[in-house]
């Protein structure tokens, strides 16, 4: 109470706070940047609103479904229960997971194969309570491992029968998730993601026949960014939905007729991307969303707030300041506090109108005068064309406090090229770890090359089945352009370091670009993507194939040039420590 704590986490990881008695104090999803989770009465209200509601007593008499010995039974008040399925087994059981139609006549359930997850050993060499080492085994599925195969099945609670659903529509799945019942109870909607992440489909299941039809299907030549860009919002007052897609080459929102899957209209369009659906007001037919690159003259990674009518008209960008923004609305959503900054611009807080974004009042400006008196210098934002000679690559440089422009300084790139996000900070901050290194006499570079997220689909596609690329042609082009502008950069002495995926990237720099990078420090790298966690690697590499070996640092270890330092934590539960040791063995 009335305290604070700091935790390290990864973008996309979710934290559930004080889970007890079905009462959540807060739910927090980590972003790509430093963020603050404020825990109070409001966070509890939001958490409980986002949580699945507790099952309500069924208002239809004698309509409860339960699982007995892996099969579905219909429970009657007279205790003359009826068995509805007979094919369930321990290895392929029906699940205690039923979604009832609005009229209570139908229920959608699932049958799923059982998968025993892979376990990996972690060696604790120096336990505190004994002399001898200990081994801990943890569940750790890896690319290519089997996935539970879920298939939907319908139940007619009036006729007390099971309605088979064609399983061919759900074969070889990564996931199969219930999403929605139609208001008239005629169809259930399920989201199907095929293994390999190259097909994502919203399927409609006829409640009376079990027939499956496509409503929306995404099947790009490369991959669907399922983990980051799956955005689906049902419009309760109509049989319509909002669906996000990169079919235009940019991540945008579309209004879909849920009765037939036809696109009613694009809601957003242009050479920018929707980052998140923030709020939908069905009464006024307006959707609020966050966007990147919506101000073409700003850094394309600056986050802005906008709104647009569901028919695609009256697009209004509500934030204007040349920086990245975060916001908080009043309960009536008539006003919002807009906080924005850049790496080279302290934070500004403004009160704005939610109607048109007009400024009501400036609330505060961050004062860094004391910091400047201590010799603090702003990061130098810089952009230059990448490998294609036209796509702009963005990053920044951090220089030593006492930089002598008549000297030349070795350069160290701090790399993390994970395709789930972009990784160059955009808001104002001290960049303490990089500054400490700069004060030793280096210039530190942070760059987002092609293959990272939240630009165009083409920009992102460079990562597909090719994590070894890591945007290096763009990074090298950026550094060479920076050296032409800043004569104190010495590109004959370029080093690189990173951890996790950044550890993989750092070693890859010496293996594939040893003529440019002369030294690397690689911490806990996922050096062979077949050794790392299943979800992250299959998201960008797809199914197991020869391309995994081609991106493996272990496979290419014989190409090593320059000086390499490897570090690893023996109890690392995020990246299998064996990944680093296999690199050592390959040398």
What feature does the model see in each segment?
Residues 51-65, 89-107, 136-145, 149-151, ...:
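Conserved beta-propeller blade repeats
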Residues 81-98, 109-165, 355-369, 423-433, ...:
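Predominantly five- to eight-bladed beta-propeller fold
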Residues 20-45, 123-130:
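Structured interaction patches on ligand/partner-binding surfaces of diverse proteins
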Residues 76-79, 157-160, 206-210, 258-260, ...:
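Short loop/turn segments that connect beta-strands within beta-propeller blades
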Residues 69-73, 116-122, 149-151, 197-203, ...:
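Structural motif
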Residues 6-12:
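Short Pro-Gly-centered beta-turn/loop motif in secreted/extracellular proteins
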Residues 81-86, 163-166, 212-219, 264-269, ...:
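Beta-propeller fold detector
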Residues 185, 191, 324-587:
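Serine-hydrolase catalytic core recognition
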């Amino acid at each position: 109470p009335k305290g604070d704590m700091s935790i390290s986490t990864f973008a996309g990881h979710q934290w559930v706070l004080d889970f007890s008695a079905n009462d959540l104090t807060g739910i927090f999803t980590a972003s790509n940047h430093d963020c603050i989770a404020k825990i109070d009465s409001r966070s509890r209200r939001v958490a409980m609103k986002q949580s699945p509601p507790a099952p309500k007593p069924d208002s239809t008499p004698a309509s409860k479904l339960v699982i007995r010995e892996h099969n579905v039974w219909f429970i009657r008040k007279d205790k003359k229960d009826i068995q509805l399925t007979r094919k369930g087994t321990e290895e392929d059981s029906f699940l205690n997971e039923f979604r009832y139609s609005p009229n209570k006549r139908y229920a959608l359930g699932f049958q799923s194969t059982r998968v025993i997850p892979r376990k990996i050993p972690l060696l604790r060499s120096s336990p505190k309570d004994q002399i001898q080492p200990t081994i801990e085994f943890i569940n750790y599925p890896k690319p290519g491992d089997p996935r539970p195969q879920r298939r939907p099945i319908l139940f007619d609670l009036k006729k007390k029968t099971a309605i088979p659903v064609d399983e061919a529509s759900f074969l070889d799945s990564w996931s199969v998730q219930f999403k929605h019942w139609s208001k008239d109870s005629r169809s259930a909607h399920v989201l199907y993601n095929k293994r390999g992440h190259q097909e994502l489909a919203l399927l409609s299941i006829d409640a009376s026949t079990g027939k499956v039809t496509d409503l929306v299907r995404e099947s790009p030549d490369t991959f669907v960014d399922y983990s980051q860009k799956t955005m689906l919002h049902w419009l309760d007052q109509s049989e319509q939905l909002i669906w996000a897609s990169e079919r235009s080459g940019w991540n945008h929102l579309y209004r879909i007729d849920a009765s037939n899957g036809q696109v009613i209209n694009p809601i957003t369009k242009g050479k920018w991307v929707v980052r998140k659906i923030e709020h939908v007001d069905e009464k006024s037919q307006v959707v609020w969303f966050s966007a990147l690159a919506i101000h073409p003259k700003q850094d394309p990674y600056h986050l802005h707030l906008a709104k647009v009518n569901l028919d695609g008209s009256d697009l209004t960008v509500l934030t204007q300041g040349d920086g990245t923004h975060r916001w908080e609305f009043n309960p009536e959503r008539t006003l919002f506090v807009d906080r924005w900054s850049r790496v080279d611009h302290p934070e500004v807080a403004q009160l704005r109108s939610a109607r048109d974004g007009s400024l009501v009042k400036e609330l505060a400006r961050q004062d860094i005068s004391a910091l400047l008196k201590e010799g603090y210098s702003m990061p130098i934002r810089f952009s230059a064309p990448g490998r294609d000679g036209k796509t702009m690559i963005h990053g920044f440089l951090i220089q030593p406090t006492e930089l002598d422009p008549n000297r030349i300084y070795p350069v160290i790139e701090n790399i993390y090229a994970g395709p789930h996000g972009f990784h160059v900070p955009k808001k104002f901050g001290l960049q303490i770890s990089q500054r400490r290194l700069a004060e030793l006499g280096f210039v530190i570079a942070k760059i987002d090359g092609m293959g990272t997220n939240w630009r165009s689909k083409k920009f992102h596609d460079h990562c597909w089945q090719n994590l070894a690329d890591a945007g290096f042609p763009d990074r090298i082009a950026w550094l060479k352009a920076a050296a032409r502008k800043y004569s104190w950069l010495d590109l004959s002495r370029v080093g690189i370091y990173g951890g996790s995926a950044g550890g993989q990237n750092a070693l890859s720099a010496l293996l594939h670009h040893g003529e440019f990078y002369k030294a690397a420090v690689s911490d806990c790298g996922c050096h062979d993507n077949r050794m790392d966690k299943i979800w992250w690697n299959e998201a960008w590499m797809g199914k197991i194939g020869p391309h995994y070996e081609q991106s493996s640092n272990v496979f290419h270890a014989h190409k090593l040039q320059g000086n390499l330092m490897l570090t690893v934590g023996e109890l690392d539960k995020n990246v299998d420590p064996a990944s680093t040791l296999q690199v050592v063995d390959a040398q």
